[in-house]
Regions:
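Asparagine-centered strand-capping/turn motif at beta-strand->loop junctions
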Residues: 34-41
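The feature marks short-to-medium sequence segments in extracytoplasmic or secretory-pathway proteins
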Residues: 47-89
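Short Pro-Gly-centered flexible turn/kink motifs
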Residues: 88-102
Length: 144
């Protein structure tokens, strides 16, 4: 069953990768970089909401420090239905990348090992594809 899951994820038209510096100081910004890649044969319209492509306007991440949840402290946007301006086109074989500073939306002022998973998955309009973004880990060190 695990092989089937991995195969399904590998064949998804929209691939999501997340990255941050693996070690940083608590007094430094920490950009979360999201890279979306269209592995499909046709273009995809990707909704920017709940992603670094838009910035922080929703609680879209599960973040823990030493297995304790870190609450979201950023702005919350009240939304209706998305309009055409809320999507961007990602052509077949194309990749797009955006980043947003995690320290603007989450309290990362304590040293320790953090785990981040993306709860709100990027959405696509044309194929209904919602990729799984990988879980990532990083360490915050005391201020220098």
């Amino acid at each position: 069953m695990m092989t089937l899951l991995l195969t399904t994820l590998a064949l998804a038209p929209l691939q999501c990768d997340l990255s941050v510096k693996t070690q940083s100081r608590v007094n430094e910004p920490l950009p979360l970089v999201m890279t979306l890649t269209n592995r499909g044969e046709g273009p995809l319209e990707v909704l920017s909401w709940f992603t670094p492509f838009e910035g922080w306007f929703a609680d879209a991440i599960d973040l823990t420090l030493d297995d304790r949840p870190i609450p979201y402290k950023g702005p919350l946007a009240k939304r209706g239905n998305p309009g055409a301006e809320d999507f961007f086109l990602l052509g077949a074989g194309q990749q797009s990348q955006a980043d947003a500073d995690l320290t603007l939306a989450y309290d990362l002022s304590r040293p320790g090992r953090y785990q981040l998973s993306y709860r709100a998955q990027p959405l696509t309009l044309t194929r209904g594809v919602a990729p799984r973004c990988p879980v990532i880990h990083f360490t915050r060190l005391p201020a220098s």
